[in-house]
Amino acid sequence: PALLRGAPRSPGAAVSLAPQPVVAITGATGFVGSHTLEAALAAGHAVRALTRRDQPPQAGVTWVRGDLADRAALGALVQGADVVIHIAGLTNTPDPAQFEAANVTGTAHVIAAMAAAGVRRLVFVSSLAARRPELSSYGASKARAEALVEASALDWTTVRPPAVYGPRDTDMLELFRAARWGLVPLPPGGATSIIHAADLAALLVVLAASTGALIARQTYEPDDGREGGWSHKELAQAIGRAVGRRRVLAPHLPRAVLAAAAAADRLARGDRAKLTPDRVGYMCHPNWVVRSDRRPPPALWGPRIAGEEGLMATAEWYRRERWL
């Protein structure tokens, strides 16, 4: 297929594939989590998934009703599991205190449930924002959650994704919609890495099924393989091409203007605002490119979806679902 670049990696001597595990997933009904659930099922795993709402029956999936604050539900989720992929968390809110409850306390509850059930293997989804916790409450909460994971007795691997895009994503959808009008306002100059949700999901499932020195107590920063990432203008133009625009106007806006826009978004959309003061804090940082020394080893995993093609396919999905 046009989107595939390279072939699936075969684990080397330092990584071995364990028997197909029972995988417990938090956040399985969200954007990244839903792709991860699909990847786990495609790999033949039995899945236990946490959900806040009733879900239709699905072959291979045991749904557990509850959330990260529900200790009984977390206990039921991890009971009998071989590995937990902890994805659930809060990425955006106008109330910074909510980051602490969801991302820090929620992670502590997952760790406690695993310890009580005797489950040792944890794949934890953090964020590249954790590299600079002083820039945002979100990044700070993810950094504190990472510290809890690292201080635990678990066999953990932490994954720090950059900007994640793909079908079912509602965050980058805003950029696609703006590009259709030919105008994509940008933060001050900088660069970012990106990764397709399907590639990220594939990595999480590989980590869940693997053992060995390459993954034990490691923190990885995966991306689409583009060296140096994407400048903000490059990404805006690529999204423009994906929606059929040969060129888009992509002005860099000063931080003060973005802060004013965040206030306006809060007035217009309330708690559903996408642009918040906290998000402005890390948007204005010039370097959200993954560190090359923290990319997952090629023997373990490599990206299969190149950015340009992935953005094109995502735009097509948005059109097909009438999101664009």
Range-by-range predicted roles:
Residues V23-A43:
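N-terminal Rossmann NAD(P)H-binding glycine-rich loop of SDR-like oxidoreductase domains
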Residues Q55, R65-T105, A113, L128-R132:
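NAD(P)H-binding glycine-rich loop region in Rossmannoid oxidoreductase-like domains
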Residues E100-V104, L135-E146, D169, S193-I195, ...:
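Short-chain dehydrogenase/reductase
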Residues A101-A143, T157:
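Conserved Rossmann-fold NAD(P)-dependent oxidoreductase catalytic core, especially the SDR/UDP-sugar
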Residues H109, T170-E174, P188-S210, A216-E221, ...:
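Substrate-positioning beta->alpha
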Residues A147-P167:
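Conserved beta-loop-beta element that borders a ligand/cofactor-binding pocket
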Residues S210-K274, R304-L324:
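Mid/C-terminal beta-alpha module of Rossmann-like enzyme folds, strongest
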